[in-house]
Amino acid sequence: MIAHSPSAPFPKLSPEEYLQWEERQREKHEYFDGQIYAMGGGSKNHSVISVRLSTLFCNHLDGGDCEIGNSDLKIQIVNTQNYTCPDVSVTCDPRDRKSTQFITYPCLVVEVLSPSTEAYDRGGKFRLYAHNPMLQDYLLVSSTSVEIDLYHKNDDGDWLILNYQASDRLELKSIGLSFAVDVIYRGLAF
């Protein structure tokens, strides 16, 4: 999704007010420290990539205890009252079954990169997610070239950045899935 500057003019909302307000909106919004940020639509490639990843994860995890969400499922940033709308997320944590509006403990978060959001997704948004003790994999998927960056948290708690391109095979340890990068990009025009 494409993030825009805070929706203006708009008064600051409490987290509870934001969640109530957001339920009535036609567009998605992220929430950070009382400010609301509109999330615009993405490109055709953005949409196709998100659907393919969601389908891949759903097929792999079918019948298990994990839940897969698209950009309609918000993530509450752990130990805060801030909310993001990643393109795809996976949680296997039973604590996330308590809420119908958001999850807090994803093991995998996917952002399909747009030129306008790439810097934020790699920097500020990653810093928000990185402190989550349950998050193991943060996947940044280009929508303008065949390239995926995987931020993987190792057993020591350090984040490793691995780059994948055409004909590479990517492994998501968080959900025990390995797949060819080409499967995600098949038939897309750049």
Swiss-Prot record:
It comes from Synechocystis sp. (strain ATCC 27184 / PCC 6803 / Kazusa). Gene3D superfamilies: tt1808, chain A (3.90.1570.10). It comes from the Bacteria. InterPro entries: Nuclease_put_TT1808, Restrct_endonuc-II-like, Uma2. It holds the Pfam family Uma2. To Synechocystis PCC 6803 sll1609 and slr1290. CDD domains: DUF820-like. Signal peptide: none annotated. The lineage of its organism: Bacteria, Bacillati, Cyanobacteriota, Cyanophyceae, Synechococcales. This is Uncharacterized protein slr1290.
